[in-house]
Amino acid sequence: MIETHIHLYSDEYAPDRALLIQNAIDIGVQKFYMPNVDVHSIAPVYAVEKAFPEHCFAMMGLHPCYVKEDYKEQLAVIEQELERRKFIAIGEVGIDLHWDKSFLTQQQEALQIQAEWALKYNLPIVIHSREANAESLEVLKPYMHRGLRGVFHCFSGSLAEVTVLKTYGWMIGIGGVVTYKKAGIDILIEEIGMGQLVLETDGPYLAPVPYRGKRNEPAYIDIVAQKIGDILHVSKEAVIEQTNANSRTLFGG
């Protein structure tokens, strides 16, 4: 399996990080893709990548919730990192209107800048869009026309938005929320099909049932794969095979 979105550098994993990673490897997780969130997470991301170089791979980007008054200074630091070394993707970036709408203009500008970087460095982009799919797509569509490729991680949206993403060949990241009864993700998955799905946990957040409300662990991605298989009436193994292929198409490797 390829875990396309997990914050392995989180302090919540500090007591047993190596054990949790090994547990996931033991059940078949081959790669873990780690999104950066701001300038302060860069060093922790690199530390985990250095400790597990065959399995853990860094993204680079500025998360929309960290787009504040100093966002231009943060973007300058992040751009320096992109110039200095290779990354698996630009991420995680996007628009988040759940907590605070006052920085929407700055979030839009930050997303535009980072979409340009994705094209410049020929990297996929990993989108965080919370209560902001219309706003995110408005910014992204011109770049999609120019060949920008990416994934909407932890996707929650409408069938119309699914259609837009499928039209541009974008991937859709599905995690533990698929196990929540009232989330309605099962209907979306039936519409998406396996051809554009990738697996994620978004750990340590959004643990699947029966661990909802607790720390999300990387091995729980197996639960996500099984649930998707149940929804689509295919085996877990078929889900893993196809989502691995989708991940390689997007991220390479």
Across the structure, where does each feature detected by a protein language model lie?
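Mid-domain alpha/beta scaffold segments of enzyme catalytic cores
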Residues: 1-253
